[in-house]
Amino acid sequence: MGLDMYLYGVKQEFHKHDYNIGGYKESTEIGYWRKANAVHAWFVECCQNGVDNCATYYVGHEDLKALRDRCEDVLLEPERAEELLPTQDGFFFGTTEYDDWYFDDIKETIEICKWALAQDFDYFEYHSSW
């Protein structure tokens, strides 16, 4: 058990000529974190309106850019990590220390965001469970 976090890239297609058919949504898992509670706290605050309920939430391109930028700021000023991207405690959420594990999660988040933003997804979705 523990905090598992997923980012999905979504392509959405609508049938323009037959509105009775609607369309489809294709989701692809493009990011996974385990117990990266600071990143999870950012998604809860910025994309989930503060609601932490293991549901799936919309994430826009601008949201991912903001997360990427915040993580880059943390790496540039690690002494401000607690202010810029604070950890979050919780049952099964892992450590709240600003240690090598924390900074590895930050680096991984930057890579996930960069890759995701370079793709042709219409939007993204974030889901967590514990």
What are these regions (language model features)?
Residues 1-130:
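Acidic (Asp/Glu-rich) sequence patches and key acidic residues
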